[in-house]
Each structure stands twice: as C-alpha cells, then as structure tokens.
C-alpha cells in the first residue's frame, strides 16, 4: 500500500455561488406593486404597511409609492408610503 496520496489530486476547489440576498430598493426609492424590496433568510427586516412577505421571507411592494425603513421596538421594519396625488 502506498503511504502517500497520488499527486495532482485535490480535495478542495468547490464552493456554492452566493445567494444574492440583501436590500434591493433603498429608503426613499420609488416602487411599483410586485417590486422586490428585500431578499433575506428569516425576518431580519419585518414587513410593515403596504408590503407583502413571500414564503422565502422576501419583502415586496403591494402598492405604488416610496420605500421607508424604520426601527420600532428593536425591529427593523419596511413600509411603502403612498405618493399623494395632486
């Protein structure tokens, strides 16, 4: 039996691709219904007014308006505020 592993072989060299998570629309940015605002694992940011929560915890806009991030009782929350029509 050989006591040394054959040369030219490697056990490393593989990795999974990044999942492209994070905030997709910034505070104050304009969104339309269906726009993804945050992609996340778990609810790091909680849904607020006029946003929906997907089964993979993606937060998306339900109405047309501007994105607003805020903190309430140690929870980060994202809302979409309706733009006042003139």
UniProtKB/Swiss-Prot annotation:
Coiled-coil regions listed: none
Family matches, as SUPFAM superfamilies: Ribosomal L27 protein-like
GO MF annotations, alphabetized: structural constituent of ribosome
Pfam families, per database record: Ribosomal_L27
Keywords carried by this UniProt record: Ribonucleoprotein, Ribosomal protein
Signal peptide from the UniProt entry: none
GO biological process: translation
PANTHER family recorded: LARGE RIBOSOMAL SUBUNIT PROTEIN BL27M, RIBOSOMAL PROTEIN L27
Protein name: Large ribosomal subunit protein bL27
Organism field: Rickettsia peacockii (strain Rustic)
């Amino acid at each position: 039996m050989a006591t040394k592993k054959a040369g030219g072989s490697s056990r490393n060299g593989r990795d999974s691709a990044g999942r492209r998570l994070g905030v997709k629309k910034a505070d104050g940015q304009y969104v339309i219904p269906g726009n993804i605002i945050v992609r996340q694992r778990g609810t790091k940011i909680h849904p607020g007014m006029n946003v929906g929560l997907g089964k993979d915890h993606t937060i998306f806009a339900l109405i047309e308006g501007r994105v607003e991030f805020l903190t309430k009782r140690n929870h980060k929350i994202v809302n979409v505020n309706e733009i006042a029509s003139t």
